[in-house]
């Protein structure tokens, strides 16, 4: 038995998920979510929205996020009463602030200094996972299908898993076939940004506000014309693309805020449903994970758009939808520490298998 910690802050930027994972059983021992401090959250919002931040402030933010990730580890270990020396390594995703693979020089950047996390926790850290995939010819995202493949390793039927974070991504798993996956488009990011702008709330709990509005069909049809939705896989996208500025250029003064929220939920539902339906009727089970798995109204919309397909939360398999990605980075850290390459060729389009991440070791005293 080996213990690893995974740290994840996704494109929703709603906090840091920390998961203690036992391997090789893939059992979640404990998980917590630590909210970002107000200063860090504000600076991240400004950075993602393209507001001016100095190079010095971005460098400071890298260290501050590292400190917050380390504090999440400290809180996790205190709650579960585990000593840092019992942990083999931490897998830290960091906080994505930009990700764009559309140009001749693809790039991705996750903040959260690995040296800071390692120094403050006394635990070896593996971080900067996505860059290795980019230089290997991949999209750098999504990685979730790798871990979904582990969970459904004994699958006897075709299933789809959709992770609804800030960006939604899909995994298709079938017996005796290569696992495939890619980014679909906006998951929660536009709904979160819109409700924050209008109501000051971080997210639309259960989709209640969206359920009070009416879908603006001309707006929905216009949004669905965005070129990203029509790209072939593999493909990936960042939250900075599907931003409020992307949305606001399509809005008209007579649109009500609640109706816009309803339309944004419909956009997420329609793009997910179309992705599933394009699998030619093979899929009979759709499992949802990520924060969007708690959105009752979104789940109802998906069930309506996908007749004949059972739409479920991954919690029905005894797996936490909130900590699945953090668990994945704990698992990825174990692969890196043990020099085990992973295969993203059918997911991100990588040219070959690769060992992901950079290792930030500690010096152990004996």
Curated annotation (Swiss-Prot):
Pfam families documented for this protein: AnmK (PF03702)
| Class of this enzyme | transferase
What residue ranges are annotated as transmembrane?
none
InterPro entries registered for this protein in UniProt:
Anhydro_N_Ac-Mur_kinase, ATPase_NBD
Q: Give the EC number(s) under which this enzyme is classified.
A: 2.7.1.170
Q: In which pathway does it act?
A: Amino-sugar metabolism; 1,6-anhydro-N-acetylmuramate degradation; Cell wall biogenesis; peptidoglycan recycling
Xref: CDD domains: ASKHA_NBD_ANMK
- Assigned keywords, A-Z: ATP-binding, Carbohydrate metabolism, Kinase, Nucleotide-binding, Transferase
The superkingdom of the source organism is Bacteria
Q: Which residues bind ATP?
A: 10-17
Q: Name one GO molecular function term.
A: phosphotransferase activity, alcohol group as acceptor
**A single GO BP annotation from the record?**
peptidoglycan turnover
Name the reaction it catalyses: 1,6-anhydro-N-acetyl-beta-muramate + ATP + H2O = N-acetyl-D-muramate 6-phosphate + ADP + H(+)
- Family statement: Belongs to the anhydro-N-acetylmuramic acid kinase family.
Q: Summarize the protein's role.
A: Catalyzes the specific phosphorylation of 1,6-anhydro-N-acetylmuramic acid (anhMurNAc) with the simultaneous cleavage of the 1,6-anhydro ring, generating MurNAc-6-P. Is required for the utilization of anhMurNAc either imported from the medium or derived from its own cell wall murein, and thus plays a role in cell wall recycling.
Protein name, per record: Anhydro-N-acetylmuramic acid kinase
**What organism is recorded for this protein?**
Legionella pneumophila (strain Lens)
């Amino acid at each position: 038995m080996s213990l690893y910690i995974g740290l994840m802050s996704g494109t929703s930027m709603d906090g840091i998920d920390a998961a203690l994972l036992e391997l090789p059983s893939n059992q979640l021992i404990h998980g917590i979510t630590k909210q970002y401090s107000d200063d860090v959250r504000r600076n991240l919002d400004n950075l993602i929205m393209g507001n001016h931040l100095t190079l010095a402030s971005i460098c400071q933010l890298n260290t501050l996020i590292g400190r917050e990730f380390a504090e999440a580890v400290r809180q996790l270990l205190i709650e579960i009463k585990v000593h840092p020396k019992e942990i083999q390594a931490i897998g830290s995703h960091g906080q994505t602030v930009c990700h764009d693979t559309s140009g001749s020089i693809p790039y991705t950047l996750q903040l959260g200094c690995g040296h800071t996390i390692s120094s403050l926790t006394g635990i070896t850290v593996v971080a900067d996972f996505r860059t290795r995939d980019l230089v290997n010819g991949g999209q750098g995202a999504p990685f979730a299908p790798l871990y979904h493949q582990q969970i459904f390793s004994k699958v006897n039927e075709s299933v789809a898993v959709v992770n609804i974070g800030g960006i939604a991504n899909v995994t298709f798993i079938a017996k005796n076939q290569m696992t495939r996956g890619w980014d679909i488009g906006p998951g929660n990011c536009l709904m979160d940004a819109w409700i924050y702008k209008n109501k000051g709330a971080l997210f639309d709990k259960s989709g209640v506000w969206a359920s009070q509005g009416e879908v603006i069909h001309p707006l929905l049809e216009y949004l669905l014309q965005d070129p990203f939705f029509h790209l072939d896989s593999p493909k990936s996208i960042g939250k900075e693309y599907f931003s409020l500025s992307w949305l606001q250029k399509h809005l008209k003064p007579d649109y009500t805020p609640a109706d816009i929220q309803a339309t944004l939920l419909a956009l997420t539902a329609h793009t997910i449903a179309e992705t599933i339906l394009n699998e030619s009727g093979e899929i009979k089970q759709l499992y949802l994970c990520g924060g969007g798995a708690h959105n009752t109204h979104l789940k109802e919309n998906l069930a309506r758009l996908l007749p004949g397909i059972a739409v479920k939360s991954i919690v029905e398999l005894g797996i936490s939808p909130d900590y699945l990605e953090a668990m994945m980075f704990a698992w990825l850290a174990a692969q890196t520490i043990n020099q085990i390459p992973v295969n993203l060729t059918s997911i991100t389009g990588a040219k070959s298998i690769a060992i992901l991440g950079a290792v930030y070791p500690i010096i152990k005293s004996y």
